[in-house]
Amino acid sequence: MALSSTEVNRIRNFCIIAHIDHGKSTLADRLLEITHTLDRTQMASAQVLDDMDLERERGITIKSHAIQMKYRASDGLEYTLNLIDTPGHVDFSYEVSRSLAACEGALLIVDATQGVEAQTIANLYLALDAGLDIIPVINKIDLPSSDVEGVARQVMDLIGIKREEILQVSAKAGIGVPELIEAIVQRIPAPADNNHLPLRALIFDSVFDSYRGAVIYLRIVEGSLKKGDRVKFFASNKIFFAEEIGTMSMKRQPKSLLESGDVGYLICSIKDVKDAKVGDTVTLADNPAHERLSGYKEVKPMVFSGLYPINSNEFEDLRESLEKLALNDASLLYTPETSVALGFGFRCGFLGLLHMEIIQERLEREYGVNIITTVPNVEYRVVMTNGEVVIVDNPSKMPDTGRINLVEEPYVTMQIITLADYIGNIMKLGMERRGEYKNTDYLDTTRVIMHFEFPLAEIVFDFHDRLKSISKGYASMDYEYIGYRDSDLVKLDVLLNGETVDALSIVVHRSKAYDWGKKLCLKLKGIIPKQMYEVAIQAAIGSKVISRETISAMRKNVLAKCYGGDISRKRKLLEKQKEGKKRMKQVGRVEVPQEAFLALLNIDE
């Protein structure tokens, strides 16, 4: 049975955009409660939509979710509200943009105690680009430290709206939430009625079910989808059979038909989530649409790191764990690699730093694999003297200096929101990290947005931690990739007794190479245990050594048994010891402890 245009008019598709910790998931809980989708007794835990422990602990949303609520409005009619919960972090901005494309409106949540933050602005711009109607909401108004009017002025300046259009709520206490639901019905437009057109549905997320394969979340933009239809995916051109379709409340609810405006799920025995890419378009194989919905792009990893099991026997466990994680996360790439120092492991590609941390934490937590991580690095584009272009994502694979014409590295544009008091500290940090300052805009009398351009390699390390510490926790940042630029980059190798340790190689800017080499040698000197012979730690660019530290040998007192006697006897014993140490040095290998690899991650401490 087809939906009448009247029923389409009673659908509202919306999402919630907010900075981390501004109360997005708590507000979603209140909406579920007021619409009786869940009652309080079923809410065993707060943040119902954040179903990973990691999501709850960090207070972030990692995966997109969709949930359908029924609500009887003040006009007496029943409305279908589809809430599409989006990740808030910059690493997942493409997923956010696809989730926004599945909506007609967005709730912009701003914390009354914190004000507008960097990710609020970044996601707001994505929502405005998608043409969404925005309902601004100030949350946490019941806290003693809230500054509702000050934050309202920031929001008015940001999106140019009247004060009375901004709603005030306390998601935790439930204050103002009924008025917010009425505003969703009144102010967010209904989807267009496009049932007569060929099917085009937008995939905004997918999860993997061990028994059913990939479960695809989609928004029907045009046409309709019936159970049993043959469906085609534009990106892979593959055809599948729609075994089950339906809508998402707290659990999957099978239906026989989804129509334009609906948000639901599709199960069609897809064994690999890479066949159901976020942003792709689904159409009917028998009556296909001519072109896909706009906005699709292949997600490319930006940050790379080597993951190695601490115990080499766990290599297969690590492989299985990565395979399972990749089933749910199409943006995680991994390829096997070997290192002389660390043995067998994987070179993994991530969307950004948070993505990398989450994957590492899930490997240790959910799969019990203990891993060593090499220094995160970015993908360099190397133009050789013969004109060939080589992509390098592992510093140890960097070609010899003599064969390189130029090296290009990825750059990002960054917005930092902070209190005006910390501008000087942030400018200093920007200069340290080769940042290019652009300009500063004032949000109000105390808060500013600073605009920079940075090499991505300079911020993948500990930039966020440093930013938080120099601004006493007040600064927030957001960045966006802008392209490659050529830079004077060199490969810095670490040698122990003349042997290169491949896992300690890094690519740095020439201006920083000496400083980095010196710090690294000193750090390793304190970590590598003394041997029976002298150990030379050297940092080198090509064949040129730029820094050196020496670990002196452990010395046994061979003269202890000579209480007096002839000096030549003592000399003979010392010469014999010297010869033995020389021989040891030739055959001995310096064992590099695991702490040495971790030392690279906190070189400045």
Curated annotation (Swiss-Prot):
A biological-process GO annotation: positive regulation of translation
Predominant subcellular localization, coarse grouping: membrane
Reactions catalysed according to its record: GTP + H2O = GDP + phosphate + H(+)
UniProt-annotated binding residues for GTP: D21, H22, G23, K24, S25, T26, N139, K140, I141, D142
Topology versus the membrane: Peripheral membrane protein
GO molecular function, one term: GTPase activity
Cell compartments where the protein resides: Cell inner membrane
Domain tr-type G stretches: 9-192
Keyword annotations: Cell inner membrane, Cell membrane, GTP-binding, Hydrolase, Membrane, Nucleotide-binding, Protein biosynthesis
UniProt GO cellular component terms: plasma membrane
Role this protein plays: Required for accurate and efficient protein synthesis under certain stress conditions. May act as a fidelity factor of the translation reaction, by catalyzing a one-codon backward translocation of tRNAs on improperly translocated ribosomes. Back-translocation proceeds from a post-translocation (POST) complex to a pre-translocation (PRE) complex, thus giving elongation factor G a second chance to translocate the tRNAs correctly. Binds to ribosomes in a GTP-dependent manner.
HAMAP family in the cross-refs: LepA
Family, per entry: Belongs to the TRAFAC class translation factor GTPase superfamily. Classic translation factor GTPase family. LepA subfamily.
Protein name in UniProt: Elongation factor 4
Species in which this protein is naturally found: Pelodictyon phaeoclathratiforme (strain DSM 5477 / BU-1)
Gene: lepA
